[in-house]
Amino acid sequence: MSYNSSNSGSGRYDDNRSGNSSYSSTSRGGSSYGNRSGSDRDYNRDGGSYNRDSSRDYNSSSGSGSGNGSSSYNKYPSSSSSSSSSSSTSSYGPSKGKDFQDSWGSSSTGTTNGYNGSSNGYNSSSNGYNSSNSSSSYGASNNGYNNSSGSSSSGSSGSSNGGSYNNSGSSNSNGYSKPTSNYSYSNGYTGPTTNYSSYSNGYSTPPTSTSTSSSSTTTTTTTTPSTSYNGGSTSYGYSTSGSSNGYGGYSQPPIPSYDPSSVSSYGAVTPASSSYNASVPGSSYGNSTYRSSGYGNQSYATTNSYGSSSYGSSGFYGNAKANTGSFGSALSPISWDLSKLPRFEKNFYLEHPDVSKFTQEEIEKFRASFQMTVKGREVPPPIMQFTQAPFPGYLMKEIIGAGFPNPTPIQSQAWPIALKGRDIIGLAKTGSGKTLAFLLPSIVHINAQPVLREDDGPIVLVLAPTRELALQIQEETNKFGGTSQISNTCVYGGASKHTQVAALKKGVEIVIATPGRLIDILESGKTNLRRVTYLVLDEADRMLDMGFEPQIRKIISQIRPDRQTLMFSATWPKEVQALAHDFLTDHIQVHIGSTEITANHNVRQIVEVCQDFEKKERMLSFLGSVGRDEKVIVFAETRKGVDDLQRVLQFSGFKSIGIHGNKSQPERDFVLSQFKNGMVPIMIATDVASRGLDIKDIKYVVNYDFPNTIEVYIHRIGRTARAGASGVSYSLLTTDNARLANELIKVLTEAKQKIPIELSNLSVTPSTSSNTKKFSPYPTYSKRY
């Protein structure tokens, strides 16, 4: 039975495949989007791809296999014998693939106990593929090594799943003979440049009693193992049969997404006990050359050391442990000793002479004009013009080139606070310029810190609730941080973790991350947050709404407590207040707009009350009244609702596209690209797109399904009328939304919007008496319902 995959199609999403029960599939896609049959969309995800370019994913280094990326799949291998061609070439995993670069082991001519390359493949796991001829590959899995869902190895007694080969009788107690030349890895699993041992794929064989018959071309060995290859272990990398420090050296379950660098084992880049920057022991990090000679050609922190005496002295490096508990439980809070931490500079503010001349009356008048309120001690005056901002010349050039007339209200007050090194809480509506409010001061902060070394963590960490918002922040970072040669990376779920980890390993000054993926990487020990001195929590209220509070607290426990922290939020609920109380020090609060929940006054709000079955007709009627090229976001409550509405709109002649959490990251990127570029004017979305999408020319927002809270309603309609533009929101309410009617009326009243009589009727609280008929806002048509 062969596993063959070919792809002769082209186009961005060539997923026209058939079948999912066979091990053979063919893609002949054109440029159609998302047309699939079967369930093989799940076979084409990050890591362990089943159905990518098979010429590189499977057996691309095969010797005498069927070629062109095909190899046979031996489901029922012999448990007692194996044969190997004298010219066999076996590879462990793909030679080239999305997450793999090198073959695991080199071939060995004439060997007798080859793990792969035998006539009877060893493994029958769902992700393992072995050739019945001399060319074979052990296969890839989602974790970059043998998935432990298959059957046990050939010749093993009592082994379970996976592919770790350790035994008490091998030449090396680690279960693997030490490589004779450099060991390199990618995603933890690419291998030595020469064999690990004398065996065909570098594996020490278990003790055997052997009878051998040879010919000029083959050697057949009958093996009776005295111990099992796996020794009963159930996951890759375990050593339970006499090995004290096997490949991974685990005496406890390893971290999922196994990587040797996360523990003290062969091939580890930095053992868990190594000190921070131990590659240059005792070196004075404080005397390093600062980028651009620091801020204003000054130097800072010329004392203390980042070498062996400071960071790392507690023995932690990323605090990676076995993931034996709930998500994030492997991260232990660090007990920080501030007296041993190297100093860092965070006050760079040089007040412009024009700002110094402002009278208190002028300052109060400026703040009042934007409904700005500030709380805290020693609040610096706002910056009213870009020329008054104390940014370096290269940043000013970028700002002027962007064509901004003046700072937004939040920027005018946040910049001097942030540049003074103070903690800040910024409360402002969406589309108010919060990203640049924290980004530009962060660039100044970075340029005054010691330069990064390899394997250092970031200096600036920005946490965002969604990958869309994280990517938008990265886009702004690339625009304004490029001239200063500041590097950044974006860490979020749904994309290749290997690529993200590789960027972190090189060293980046700014990391923009969603909490879940960052926790995952921290637990695996691939990076650390010991260099972070500038922390940003963007859309903090949204992160708490999404349940990220435990992850946020875990992440902050890994950051030195004397950092500078900036928190931005559109609302100020008690949960956000509690978070600010716990993690901000001597902060200044800046609130733009009313302290009540209010909507953008530039949005014309249209509200209609109807029955549920009327909603589609009313939506289509409204969309028919707007220009065909105008950008519209339609919000639905569920993923199924998004897909259903897309079909309805397409059938009705409206060009539309949908986005929700079930779509892969490439699909979501494609949808956003089509919508941003105007190729598709209507985007249907769940609330995954209701926050952080910075698309400035959205004219209309349609609430097909009214949200569960007024806060979400305000965030949704905030997608339009950004950066001073005007927009329109159109919302459909049913009797199911009656509990929100009073709050909605308050929002409409504050924004001086028209209140329909049906909404007023809906806001009347019906009697709870059992004799009271069901309330309806439609007295004229009540008999019809």
UniProtKB/Swiss-Prot annotation:
GO biological process, one term: alternative mRNA splicing, via spliceosome
E.C. number: 3.6.4.13
A Pfam family recorded for this sequence: DEAD
Bias type Low complexity, positions: 1-11, 18-37, 49-95, 105-177, 192-233
UniProt subcellular location: Cytoplasm; Nucleus
Residue stretches of biased makeup (Polar residues): 178-191, 764-774
Keywords: ATP-binding, Cytoplasm, Helicase, Hydrolase, Nonsense-mediated mRNA decay, Nucleotide-binding, Nucleus, Ribosome biogenesis, RNA-binding, rRNA processing
Family matches, as InterPro entries: DEAD/DEAH_box_helicase_dom, Helicase_ATP-bd, Helicase_C-like, P-loop_NTPase, RNA-helicase_DEAD-box_CS, RNA_helicase_DEAD_Q_motif
Reactions catalysed: ATP + H2O = ADP + phosphate + H(+)
Region Disordered: start-end pairs: 1-233, 764-785
Domain of life: Eukaryota
Motif DEAD box, chain ranges: 538-541
Keyword check for Chaperone: no
GO molecular function: ATP binding; ATP hydrolysis activity; mRNA binding; RNA binding; RNA helicase activity
Binding site residues for ATP: 428-435
Enzyme class, broadest EC rank: hydrolase
Keyword Nucleus: yes
Domain Helicase ATP-binding: 415-590
Domain Helicase C-terminal per the UniProt entry, residue ranges: 602-763
Short motif Q motif, span: 384-412
GO cellular component: cytoplasm; nucleus; ribonucleoprotein complex
Role according to the record: Probable ATP-dependent RNA helicase which may be involved nonsense-mediated mRNA decay and ribosome biogenesis through rRNA processing.
PANTHER family linked: ATP-DEPENDENT RNA HELICASE DBP3
Domain notes: The Q motif is unique to and characteristic of the DEAD box family of RNA helicases and controls ATP binding and hydrolysis.
Family the UniProt entry places it in: Belongs to the DEAD box helicase family. DDX5/DBP2 subfamily.
Entry protein name: Probable ATP-dependent RNA helicase ddx17
Organism: Dictyostelium discoideum
Gene this protein is translated from: ddx17
